[in-house]
């Protein structure tokens, strides 16, 4: 569903910007296929400024459909969105994007990369980053971005446990809105406070007690 390496390249080198709106975007009513088929019924979700949402559900339940609609609405609302797909179609392109950045901006991204456990100097001289290195580099770019929203689809793919723990800390410090698709329960518990559960053609909204920021 994501054509996001273009989005990623455009987002690199910026920092979080608060749009000032309390509700960034809403999705309400039925979500239909172009042919008219109802894919999700009676949806009623709103992403608020600074809200941290996990989108959960079985494979094929409609998570990608909900995210596609959410991203379209965010685009219509002119929100700056940082997006990480489940898989990067061209990991080497991420590295090339970083190499072409202004030195000050590149330094900021590489500094964030170091906090994710990667030696920036080693990555910059490689011919082709590993899947894990490319993913961390993409995450470093997004975490250094001017974005009011991060949308991350299975960000722990290709990451080892220490890297996942560093990502948990980085997302806990992120002060924009976050929409996270993950099967990693520890990451979800550390980074999100609300769950949008997609099942049986519907979206159930649940406030997750005991998570950060939840009474």
Predicted regions and their residues:
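ABC ATP-binding cassette signature C-motif
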Residues: 17-215
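Coiled-coil termination/hinge junctions
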Residues: 1-26
């Amino acid at each position: 569903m994501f054509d996001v390496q273009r989005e990623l390249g455009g987002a690199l080198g910026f920092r979080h910007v608060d749009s000032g709106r309390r509700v960034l975007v809403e999705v309400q009513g039925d979500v239909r296929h172009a042919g008219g088929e109802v894919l999700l019924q009676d949806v009623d979700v709103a992403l608020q400024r600074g809200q941290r949402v996990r989108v959960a559900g079985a494979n094929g339940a409609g998570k990608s459909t909900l995210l596609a609609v959410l991203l379209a609405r965010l685009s219509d609302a002119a929100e700056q969105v940082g997006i990480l797909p489940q898989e990067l179609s061209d990991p080497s392109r991420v590295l090339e994007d970083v190499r072409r950045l202004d030195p000050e901006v590149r330094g900021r991204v590489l500094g964030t990369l170091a906090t994710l456990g990667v030696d920036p100097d080693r990555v910059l001289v490689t011919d082709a980053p590993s899947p894990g290195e490319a993913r961390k580099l993409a995450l470093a770019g997004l975490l250094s971005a001017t974005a009011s929203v991060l949308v991350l689809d299975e960000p722990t793919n290709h990451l080892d446990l220490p890297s996942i723990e560093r990502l948990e800390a980085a997302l806990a410090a992120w002060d924009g809105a976050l929409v996270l698709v993950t099967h990693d329960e520890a990451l979800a518990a550390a980074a999100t406070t609300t769950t949008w559960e997609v099942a049986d053609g519907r979206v159930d909204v649940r406030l997750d007690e005991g998570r950060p920021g939840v009474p």
